[in-house]
């Protein structure tokens, strides 16, 4: 006798109710936190709030620097209920949007893999820690997840029932996603290709679908693009910050994750603003000069995308989420990421149009996000897609386990073994792979790809160093014991930087817990065995504190410095993700490189 079937409609509304209740409880628990009530002026949250209130008063910005949906449409509409910018209207509306996103994930997974999978997908998203956590904050992540879920749902429906109505919904969803976050533009080529492939034998129907999708995509974007173009005197999209954002994750100094503003970011942005080379042109030139380094950076970003590590920005789940006991009980990325990757591996590769649409959106989101730079909140929009495939993976694993018990054949056992291997591989990628690469392989990789370290030829200065990114790299402070210590650091200077005549130079050494209220420590400095008389001072740059040693000397191909420090409580940073063998402490080789830079005046 078969068991009673689940009432799918009731199950969907149950998913919606659970999702909404969980989000409302977390909103209530976090409603008194500083980041909700009074976010810092330097955060995107306060910027969005300020812009929305100004727009409600009729003061529109000259250009839309950020993607404009959130602060030109959503927040002004939410503040109708609280003209002074109260916290509860946006929170309540974002809780509803999050719950509807769970409903969309449920229906999408049901159409792709069956109703049981759909219910599991909705429940996974309903209790996803990161999706719930961002609900109370004035950040666009919940909305971006909604647009991603709607894009996936519309694409699946269009592939299953090819008509202009679903094409129009798909175009509108892509427009909403693009107006919320710019990397959604990179989804569209694959979706357009799927439309052509699906409708190739029905040309008239395909033309209607393309026309409807294009109109629904262009019409919402056009007013913002026209506004930006008129005020910038050049053709622009809905946002004018694309070049700056692209440069944050695509430069010789850029980390794969974290928000860091290296020297090249400012130099390239200033060059573009002055009418010189565009940021895109700078990136292409650099990629041509160091193709393997560029490839390594992008592959590392692709790997980091799946990593369970949170890269906080604006808010941190470990800090801002402490006030919510419920949040600690929800599913973290380490579980959902592993299950989602597993589902992609075992369920995503079937040649059906609807499955291909889901697979494309998953791959396009992964690639388009990794093409820029990674923060924890950038992955929130991926969670609906992730939960759909996670649910499919769970159901498929259960099916193979049952099949292996019922059918004792080598094929059934092999099928289960493949699934088990895919699950273990997914767990390794999400929880261990990135750290293992950075700790064990990266020093050797960079010793091979970039043997001389980084050499920057900037308009105002030239810089040579061996360490990696400051914010999301391998830098750790090494506390020096009391007494005198000799730090050895060697630089390899490229030919174009050499000078026989004296040049003003600065040797920067990143320090920790420096007592800035006192004078810098006594320093003895030697270069290639010759004593120098540097001017020592504390220096703050790129959100880091440095001990600067300024002197004038010729620039040689090999600069071997010996820095003798005598200072209590001074920590000096060492980067364990780089090891060229060019750093020593008291004559002994270190397992990394000092975070030190040689800056040469032009």
Regions found by a protein language model. Give the residues of each.
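Multi-pass, polyprenyl lipid-linked donor-dependent membrane glycosyltransferases
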Residues: 66, 70-71, 89-100, 120-155, ...
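Membrane-interface helix-loop-helix junctions at transmembrane boundaries of multi-pass membrane enzymes
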Residues: 4-10, 161-165, 198-212, 319-327, ...
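Short hydrophobic/aromatic helix or loop-helix immediately within or flanking a transmembrane segment
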Residues: 44-57, 61-85, 92, 96, ...
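Transmembrane-helix signature of polytopic, membrane-embedded enzymes
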Residues: 88-89, 102-127, 145-146, 160-162, ...
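Short hydrophobic alpha-helices at membrane interfaces in multi-pass membrane enzymes
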Residues: 116-119, 154-175, 204-211
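Juxtamembrane membrane-water interface segments immediately following transmembrane helices
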Residues: 15, 19, 26-61, 209-274, ...
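Lumenal/periplasmic acceptor-binding loop at the mouth of the active site in multi-pass
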Residues: 57-60, 69-76, 257-344
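Transmembrane alpha-helix segments characteristic
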Residues: 20, 125, 169-174, 212, ...
């Amino acid at each position: 006798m078969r068991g009673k079937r689940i009432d799918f409609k009731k199950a969907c509304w149950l998913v919606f109710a659970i999702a909404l209740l969980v989000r409302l409880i977390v909103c209530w628990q976090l409603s008194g936190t500083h980041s909700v009530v009074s976010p810092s002026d330097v955060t995107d949250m306060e910027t969005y709030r300020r812009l929305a209130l100004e727009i409600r008063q009729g003061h529109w910005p000259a250009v839309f620097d950020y993607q404009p949906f959130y602060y030109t449409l959503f927040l002004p509409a939410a503040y109708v209920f609280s003209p002074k910018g109260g916290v509860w209207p946006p929170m309540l509306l974002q809780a509803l949007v999050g719950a509807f996103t769970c409903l969309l994930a449920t229906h999408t997974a049901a159409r792709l893999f069956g109703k049981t999978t759909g219910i599991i997908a909705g429940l996974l998203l309903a209790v996803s820690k990161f999706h719930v956590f961002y609900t109370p904050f004035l950040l666009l992540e919940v909305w971006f997840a909604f647009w991603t879920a709607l894009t996936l749902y519309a694409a699946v429906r269009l592939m299953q029932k090819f008509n202009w109505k679903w094409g129009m919904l798909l175009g509108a969803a892509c427009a909403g996603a693009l107006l919320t976050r710019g990397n959604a533009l990179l989804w569209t080529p694959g979706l357009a290709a799927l439309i052509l492939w699906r409708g190739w034998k029905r040309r008239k129907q395909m033309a209607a679908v393309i026309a409807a999708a294009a109109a629904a995509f262009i019409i919402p974007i056009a007013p913002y693009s026209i506004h930006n173009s008129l005020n910038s005197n050049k053709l622009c999209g809905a946002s004018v910050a694309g070049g700056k954002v692209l440069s944050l994750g695509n430069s010789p100094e850029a980390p794969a994750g974290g928000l860091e503003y290296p020297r090249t970011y400012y130099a390239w942005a200033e060059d573009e603003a002055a009418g010189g080379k565009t940021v895109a042109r700078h990136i292409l030139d650099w990629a041509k000069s160091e193709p393997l380094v560029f490839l390594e950076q992008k592959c590392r970003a692709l790997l980091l995308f799946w990593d369970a590590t949170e890269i906080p920005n604006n808010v941190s789940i470990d800090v801002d989420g402490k006030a919510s006991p419920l949040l600690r009980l929800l599913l973290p990325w380490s579980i959902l990421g592993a299950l989602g990757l597993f589902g992609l591996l075992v369920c995503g590769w079937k040649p059906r149009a609807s499955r291909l649409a889901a697979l494309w959106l998953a791959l396009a989101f992964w690639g388009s996000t990794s093409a820029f730079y990674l923060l924890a909140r950038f992955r929130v929009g991926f969670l609906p897609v992730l939960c759909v495939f996670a649910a499919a993976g769970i159901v498929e694993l259960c099916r193979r386990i049952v099949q292996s018990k019922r059918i004792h054949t080598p094929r059934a056992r092999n099928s289960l073994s493949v699934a088990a291997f895919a699950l273990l591989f997914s767990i390794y990628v999400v929880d261990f792979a990135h750290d293992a690469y950075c700790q064990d392989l990266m020093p050797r990789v960079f010793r091979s790809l970039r043997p001389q370290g980084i050499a920057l030829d900037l308009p105002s200065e030239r810089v040579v160093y061996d360490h990696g990114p400051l914010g999301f790299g391998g830098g750790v402070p090494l506390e020096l014991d009391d007494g005198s210590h000799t730090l050895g650091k060697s630089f390899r200077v490229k030919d174009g930087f050499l000078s026989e005549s004296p040049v003003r130079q600065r040797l920067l050494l990143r320090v920790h817990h420096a007592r800035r209220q006192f004078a810098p420590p006594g320093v003895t400095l030697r270069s290639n065995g010759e004593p120098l008389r540097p001017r020592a001072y504390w220096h703050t740059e790129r959100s880091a504190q440095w001990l600067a040693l300024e002197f004038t000397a010729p620039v040689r191909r090999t600069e071997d410095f010996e820095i003798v420090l005598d200072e209590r409580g001074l920590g000096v940073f060492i980067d364990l993700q780089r090891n060229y063998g060019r750093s020593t402490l008291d004559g002994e080789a270190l397992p990394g490189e000092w975070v030190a830079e040689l800056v040469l005046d032009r």
